[in-house]
């Protein structure tokens, strides 16, 4: 084995304002598999996480429920920990950002950064709710669009005409929280001078800490110029007060990543581990953050700059993964595919999903799809039909011979293929390319099953004098099963324990596997059962019911059908419709708009002509996911001068808003510039 490594690993902190769902589980399962693999290899690998427990949303949710914020986050944390435990996530410590450790570390880092001259103060004007005495983020303000007159629009952008504006430009603005009319109010805010770290970050992001595609995307942001980072919020706010600034609180994204350090600090205080050994600037230990692609800027720009400025080490690697889709689409509450972890666990074994995710996950940032039909087929075929089948087909013959395995390797070539595969599979685990690891393992399972089928011990056993050959064949089969379960142990820890009980030995993997001969095994018991389609259907139905119950709990109106909510408009003549020139357009480029919460800037290719269009779809799409898609645009809409530039058209999208927005895409074969009639 190589030298023992000291590794600290984290997953992104789930927000303490809702339940864990299967999207969250992509990351924690991915991380847990990697950690379990490292521990099996003999390394000192520590896995910590915490609830992200601060912010206005948590404060308001607690108020809505009639409890204190502390009571709210304590309940959610208990629910989160139960879900993770039942999904076999092996945290070494799980904490909360609302902790004394996090408060002390946040103060320390802030004071160091401030002493280095990297905290700026300046007054900004914000919308203020005079009834709640609360500064309002744009999402907490609604009113009538000042440009097109559409009602019920958010405070920075109109979803009807895509116009952008300041909250105070809205007609009849109101606070979503109290219904009061907001007023403009000045306040001093504190900023981390991130632009001063541009040179450092350009080097850091190209130094092997990130996947290439992530580094390339960050290069675009760095070249466009960074903005100072507002790290403060005004009271009332649930969080940590900034030292020396009464009534000012750290913005949640300041103390949230510090929560990684705080959780590890709590572990160190409990176990005697050396905190500084892992976090000092010249540490030889390794630090890995597993995160989703939606929070890359916080972890790969703000976080390394903050850490380095405060005299701490930066991450060895930020491992970025994609999003989860279900049956090829975004998770949907109405379709029942927005599945909470607990709903899944009420119906299915956790290892089914752990294996399926592993079979899909690569080292890239690509999204993964939970195709429910494929999920059932793959689990039943791979785990039950292939892996478990090896043991179930051979164990009874060993038991009949007395229960002891033969030391004779009847097919040395086959066994060596299992031994040599260990290094290849280990490399795939190390690189987080679990899908390749699973393919290698299933290929071994196929070899083992083919060998058993060819030898047919059930037929040999019927012929007198074949007792030793039957034992030799089945002993090799059992050893093949043992090798496969060893390689699968990071993915299937629960089944691995059951396999260890059957085999009468621990599954270890610190080097090449040895053959288990002259060893007594125990009676075989079924290790895994098939998934029945009825369980999937029941899970989907329960997800729909849970969504309806939650909507009732938080006093949201019942969901009407789109047609009932927005009836069909008055009839128009064909000539009126013909005035609207709809064209197929290729999205040649898409990028974030600095300072806009809801807008993306799209460059549309009409087949010889390009248009610049601002679209209010940021809540539903990442820019990189749009590039290369075809869509439909209104090509003859009069250009509008907006805050961020000229918009030369409009793309068409449907949906109620938020994450449920869907741009229109033509069928394959439609070309840029074609008219839609």
Curated annotation (Swiss-Prot):
Keywords assigned by UniProt, alphabetized: Aminoacyl-tRNA synthetase, ATP-binding, Cytoplasm, Ligase, Metal-binding, Nucleotide-binding, Protein biosynthesis, RNA-binding, tRNA-binding, Zinc
Entry's localization field: Cytoplasm
Cofactor, free-text remark: Binds 1 zinc ion per subunit.
Origin species: Saccharophagus degradans (strain 2-40 / ATCC 43961 / DSM 17024)
Locus of motif 'KMSKS' region: 330-334
UniProt-recorded name of the protein: Methionine--tRNA ligase
Residues where ATP binds: 333
Positions annotated to bind Zn(2+): 145, 148, 158, 161
CDD domains given in the database record: Anticodon_Ia_Met, MetRS_core, tRNA_bind_EcMetRS_like
Catalytically driven reaction(s): tRNA(Met) + L-methionine + ATP = L-methionyl-tRNA(Met) + AMP + diphosphate
EC numbers for this chain: 6.1.1.10
Quaternary structure note: Homodimer.
A GO CC term attached to the entry: cytosol
């Amino acid at each position: 084995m190589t030298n023992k490594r000291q590794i600290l690993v984290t997953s992104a902190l789930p927000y303490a304002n809702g339940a864990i769902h299967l999207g969250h589980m992509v990351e924690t399962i991915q991380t847990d598999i990697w950690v379990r693999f490292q521990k099996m290899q003999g390394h000192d690998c520590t896995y910590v996480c915490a609830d992200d427990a601060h912010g206005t949303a948590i404060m308001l949710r607690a108020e809505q429920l009639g409890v204190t914020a502390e009571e709210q986050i304590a309940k959610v944390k208990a629910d989160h920990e139960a879900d993770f435990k039942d999904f076999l996530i092996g945290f070494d410590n799980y904490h909360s950002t609302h902790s004394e450790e996090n408060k002390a570390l946040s103060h320390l880092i802030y004071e160091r950064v401030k002493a280095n001259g990297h905290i700026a103060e300046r007054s900004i004007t914000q919308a203020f709710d005079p009834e709640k005495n609360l500064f309002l983020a744009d999402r907490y303000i609604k009113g009538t669009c000042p440009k097109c007159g559409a009602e019920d629009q958010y405070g920075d952008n109109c979803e009807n005409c895509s116009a952008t504006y300041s909250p105070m430009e809205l007609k009849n603005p109101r606070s979503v929280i109290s219904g009061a009319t907001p007023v403009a109010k000045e306040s001093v805010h504190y900023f981390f001078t991130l632009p001063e770290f541009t040179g450092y970050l350009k080097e850091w992001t190209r130094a092997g800490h990130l996947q290439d595609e992530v580094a390339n995307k960050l290069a675009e942001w760095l070249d466009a110029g960074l903005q100072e980072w507002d790290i403060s919020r005004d009271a009332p706010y649930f969080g940590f007060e900034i030292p020396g600034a009464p009534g000012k609180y750290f913005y949640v994204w300041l103390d949230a990543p510090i929560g990684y350090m705080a959780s590890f600090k709590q572990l160190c205080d409990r176990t005697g581990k050396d905190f500084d050994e892992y976090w000092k600037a010249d540490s030889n230990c390794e630090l890995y953050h597993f995160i989703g692609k939606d929070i890359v800027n916080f972890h790969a720009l703000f976080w390394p700059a903050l850490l380095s400025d405060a005299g701490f080490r930066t991450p060895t690697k930020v491992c970025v993964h994609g999003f989860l889709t279900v049956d090829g689409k975004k998770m949907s509450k109405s379709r029942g595919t927005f599945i909470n972890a607990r709903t899944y666990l009420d119906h299915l074994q956790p290892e089914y999903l752990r294996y399926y995710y592993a079979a899909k996950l690569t080292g890239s940032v690509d999204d993964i799809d939970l195709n429910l039909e494929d999920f059932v087929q793959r689990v039943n075929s791979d785990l039950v039909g292939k892996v478990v089948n090896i043991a179930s087909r051979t164990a009874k013959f060993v038991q009949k011979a007395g229960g002891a395995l033969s030391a004779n390797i009847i097919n040395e070539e086959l066994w060596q293929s299992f031994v040599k595969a260990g290094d290849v599979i280990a490399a795939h685990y190390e690189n987080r390319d679990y899908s390749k690891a699973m393919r290698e393992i299933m290929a071994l399972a196929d070899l083992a099953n083919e060998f058993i089928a060819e030898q047919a011990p059930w037929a040999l056993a019927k012929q007198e004098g074949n007792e030793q050959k039957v034992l030799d064949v089945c002993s090799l089969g059992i050893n093949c099963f043992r090798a496969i379960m060893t390689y699968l142990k990071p993915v299937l820890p629960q089944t691995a324990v059951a396999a260890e009980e059957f085999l009468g030995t621990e599954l270890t993997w610190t080097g090449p596997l040895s053959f288990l001969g002259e060893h007594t095994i125990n009676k075989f018991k079924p290790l895994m059962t098939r998934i029945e389609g009825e369980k999937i259907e029941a899970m989907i139905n329960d997800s729909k019911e849970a969504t309806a119950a939650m909507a009732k709990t938080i006093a949201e109106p019942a969901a009407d059908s789109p047609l009932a909510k927005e009836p069909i408009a008055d009839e128009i003549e064909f000539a009126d419709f013909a005035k609207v020139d709809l064209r197929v357009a290729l999205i040649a480029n898409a990028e974030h708009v600095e300072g806009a919460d809801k807008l993306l800037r799209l460059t549309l290719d009409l087949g010889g002509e390009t248009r610049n269009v601002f679209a209010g779809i940021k809540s539903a799409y990442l820019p990189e996911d749009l590039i290369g898609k075809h869509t439909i645009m209104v090509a003859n809409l009069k250009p509008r001068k907006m805050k961020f530039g000229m918009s030369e058209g409009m793309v068409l999208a449907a949906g109620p808003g938020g994450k449920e927005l869907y741009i229109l895409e033509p069928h394959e074969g439609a070309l840029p510039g074609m008219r839609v009639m």
